[in-house]
Regions:
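A contiguous strand-loop segment
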Residues: 1-101
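Proteins synthesized as precursors that undergo proteolytic processing into mature forms
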Residues: 98-133
Length: 133
């Protein structure tokens, strides 16, 4: 199970840290995603264009999957492993009505948020516009 922590300094700056306790060994490398980078979601239903550049630890599976990172606006995000607790939309069950929101796979959520959001508030609003699958 992964752990994340934020610490606010006496100067008002925020520092972010995390552990990478996944169920399988990761071989992450440092990757940079440029502003304006375009990619298709894993469902291949939507083309996404990043507003912000970002840097983080990622693995080229392919595609390149970011475990964490920070963008040019200072917004940070991370994938945390919570076995048995995380639940996502099961769009393959046939019981879910047609949903017009773009499906974003859990493993591409960090890239999606870092590329499109400048703040936690903006990321929270963005989550209402997508379907995490």
């Amino acid at each position: 199970m992964c752990t994340a922590i934020t610490i606010r300094t006496s100067q008002g700056n925020t520092c972010f840290g995390r552990t990478m306790d996944f169920s399988y060994p990761l071989d992450p490398e440092l990757y940079i995603s440029p502003r304006g980078y375009e990619w298709n979601n894993l469902a291949a239903t939507h083309r996404i264009r990043s507003r912000y550049s970002f840097i983080g630890a990622a693995q080229d599976l392919p595609p390149v999957i970011f475990a964490d990172g920070v963008n040019e606006m200072g917004f940070a995000a991370a994938v945390l492993y919570f076995p048995g607790y995380a639940k996502y939309d099961d769009s393959g069950s046939g019981d879910i009505p047609e949903d017009p929101r773009p499906p974003i796979a859990a493993i591409e959520l960090v890239s999606f948020l870092l590329g499109l959001c400048a703040s936690v508030r903006q990321a929270a609003s963005m989550l209402d516009t997508i379907r995490i699958v």
